[in-house]
Design a protein with these regions (language model features):
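Acidic, PIN/NYN-like endoribonuclease modules and their adjacent C-terminal/linker elements
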Residues: 118-157
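Active-site-proximal, substrate-binding regions of enzyme catalytic domains
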Residues: 2-116, 131-133, 137
Length: 157
């Protein structure tokens, strides 16, 4: 079974086809992991926003259904064990236009990928160059880089 971690842009890039592609991936024995921080951003925050556009609400509900049906597995990194990785990721992802306190879901992804890669091969699906570079550097230093593959969203799902 392959373990595939999805970031927010990996979900967004597929648009309305996302549920169909998730079903197809799971049928080929893939385990699709959605970080809880990504779910917060794409589902919870949207459904809690009264002024969210209807198409955003529909997309959020579709993602929630995939979670409820077991097609997407929610995971958090072990915050205590990987707090240094989370802090480093937040610093690396932040820049002049995005202060550290505004870095949201992506800061947890390198820690989750590193944790999962301790026991199995992991594919991170993202088009975000900064996140890719951060994961590449951190997993190399954590001695799990050989267990991690970085893939473009349109090539995996």
């Amino acid at each position: 079974m392959s373990v595939i971690v999805l970031d927010a842009n990996a979900v967004i890039m597929h648009g309305r086809a996302f549920p169909e592609r998730v079903h197809a991936a799971v049928e080929t024995d893939a385990k699709l992991v959605l970080p809880r921080s990504v779910k917060q951003e794409l589902v919870d925050d949207v459904l809690n926003a009264e002024d969210a556009p209807e198409n955003h609400r529909a997309a959020a509900q579709a993602i929630q259904e995939l979670i409820d049906e077991g097609y997407l597995v929610l995971r958090n990194p072990d915050y205590e064990a990987y707090s240094d990785v989370i802090d480093e990721a937040r610093r690396r992802i932040a820049n002049d236009s995005l202060p550290e306190h505004d870095v949201k879901a992506d800061q947890y992804i390198p820690a989750l990928v590193t944790e999962l890669a301790q026991n199995e091969a992991v594919t991170l699906v993202t088009a975000d160059r900064k996140l890719r570079e951060t994961v590449r550097e951190i997993t190399k230093r954590q001695n799990v880089a050989d267990q991690v593959t970085l893939s473009d969203p349109l090539t995996v799902l």
